């Protein structure tokens, strides 16, 4: 009971913080380690904000990856999707700034199988009653949104701390749990 109550109180406080600052905050940035539950949290937060009368729009920073041939590599020569340089920061900021001033934007979609970015059909224009829910590992990195007024942003850090145990003596660490989640996600949704 106590842990569930604490989660409910925490969730309600987040809702109130965003609602009370809604006139200024138009971007909620969600960050956390790889496979920590950012996308799931974004979906749940969106539903909570809808209950409060807000209209959230979810955007994944992963859709702003540079094309595969421009993706940086780590010391082993493997693609480093967790590097900030793997993101087209200029396009990301251009899109955010355009949305905040009421311009129409063509939002990108990254195809992990082809390693290329494409675009959704049509354009998107942010309405006054909408808030952007943006999730990605660099969501709280100040270098991701250097030209966005901090008063317009609200940041949330998410981490999967739930422990799973094989038995009473053999717990699976949070890091290993995230690795398992990442392997399943990459296989099911990213083609590798």
What are these regions (language model features)?
Residues 52-69:
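Short beta-strand-centered segment that lines the nucleotide-binding/catalytic pocket of NTP-utilizing
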Residues 28-30:
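Hydrophobic anchor at the beta1->P-loop junction of P-loop NTPases
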Residues 38:
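Conserved lysine of the Walker
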Residues 19-25:
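Phosphate-binding P-loop
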Residues 41, 45:
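Hydrophobic positions on the alpha1 helix immediately C-terminal to the Walker A/P-loop
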């Amino acid at each position: 009971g106590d842990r569930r109550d604490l989660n409910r109180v925490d969730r309600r406080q987040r809702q109130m913080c965003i609602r009370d600052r809604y006139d200024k905050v138009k971007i909620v940035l969600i960050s956390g380690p790889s496979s920590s539950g950012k996308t799931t949290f974004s979906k749940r937060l969106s539903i909570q904000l809808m209950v409060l009368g807000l209209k959230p729009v979810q955007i994944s920073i992963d859709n702003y990856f540079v094309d595969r041939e421009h993706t940086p590599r780590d010391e082993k020569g493997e693609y480093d999707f967790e590097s900030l340089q793997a993101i087209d920061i200029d396009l990301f900021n251009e899109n955010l700034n355009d949305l905040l001033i009421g311009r129409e934007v063509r939002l990108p979609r990254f195809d992990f199988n082809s390693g290329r970015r494409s675009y959704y059909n049509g354009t998107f224009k942010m309405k006054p009653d909408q808030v952007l829910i943006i999730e990605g590992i660099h969501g709280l990195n100040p270098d991701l949104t250097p030209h966005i007024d901090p008063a317009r942003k609200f940041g949330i850090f998410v981490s999967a701390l739930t422990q799973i145990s094989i038995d009473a003596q053999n717990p699976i660490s949070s890091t290993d749990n995230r690795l398992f989640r990442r392997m399943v996600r990459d296989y099911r949704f990213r083609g590798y």
